[in-house]
UniProtKB/Swiss-Prot annotation:
Upper taxonomic lineage: Bacteria, Pseudomonadati, Pseudomonadota, Alphaproteobacteria, Caulobacterales
Pfam annotation, one family: adh_short_C2
Record key words, sorted: NAD, Oxidoreductase
Protein name: D-xylose 1-dehydrogenase
Top EC class for this record: oxidoreductase
Species annotation: Caulobacter vibrioides (strain ATCC 19089 / CIP 103742 / CB 15) (Caulobacter crescentus)
Length: 248
């Protein structure tokens, strides 16, 4: 698909968490096409190295850095190494299925840490540098799941609901420094991982539930994120922006 070019993104320093596969890979590729300097964080070495090689011909080739976002010291270390940035995309997460009866205290901590906690601490790490650079954009990833009340995802949905609240609070706190904080809420996005799950019948059910009949792919999500990161969205902050084809 073709996409808009945002001159304001050229040369911007962008960090994308979970940028090595799925929606994240689409984000990494999208910012690279804009001429941004992209650093993407992940723990999936094989996928991330493959993406790095695939995008090596970009105006500024993206750089992969391995970082376990569940480790707060690792977050501090990687951002100290990266330095100041203009854009942070908090994309990383994991929607492991579970039943209420199976949830333990340790599993609660793990799910909240992998889906919510790192977003706060990554934002904390970049905010001083963004202030010094005269502003910036933080884009968090929510989920349609808790708006729909999907089953077997209570901790994932709890974390994703929290992200929307955190977005609003951070937008208020960081706004005086011209740091914008927004939240993207994707619908059902067709990634390589999801292609392994869904039968043709399942695909048809997803499309039937949408107002629009197109299937959402990572490039569609990236198009929204690129806009929110650009100067064209200079007065967009504190709210959720949906890309769900009307599935709600």
């Amino acid at each position: 698909m073709s996409s808009a070019i945002y001159p304001s993104l050229k040369g911007k320093r962008v960090v994308i968490t979970g940028g090595g596969s799925g929606i994240g890979a689409g984000l990494t590729a999208g910012f690279a096409r804009q001429g941004a300097e992209v650093i993407f964080l992940d723990i999936a070495d094989e996928d991330s190295r493959a993406l790095e090689a695939e995008l090596a011909g970009s105006p500024i080739p993206p750089v992969y850095k391995r970082c376990d976002l569940m480790n707060l010291e690792a977050i501090k270390a990687v951002f100290a190494e990266i330095g100041d940035v203009d854009v942070l995309v908090n994309n990383a997460g994991n929607d492991d299925r579970h039943k209420l009866a199976d949830v333990t205290g340790a599993y609660w901590d793990e799910r909240i840490n992998v889906n919510l906690r790192h977003m706060l601490f990554c934002t904390q790490a970049v905010a001083p540098g963004m202030k010094k650079r005269g502003g910036g954009a933080v884009i968090n990833f929510g989920s349609i799941s808790w708006h729909l009340g999907l089953e077997d995802l209570v901790l994932y949905e709890t974390a994703k609901a929290g992200i929307e609240g955190m977005t609003r609070a951070l937008a208020r706190e960081l706004g005086p420094d011209d740091i914008r904080v927004t939240c993207v809420v994707p619908g059902n996005v067709k990634t390589k991982r999801q292609e392994k799950w869904y039968t043709p019948e399942g695909e048809a059910q997803i499309v039937a539930a949408q107002c629009l009949k197109g299937r959402i792919v990572p490039e569609n999500v990236a198009a929204l994120v690129l806009f929110l990161a650009s100067d064209d969205a200079s007065l967009c902050t504190g709210h959720e922006y949906w890309i769900d084809a009307g599935w709600r």
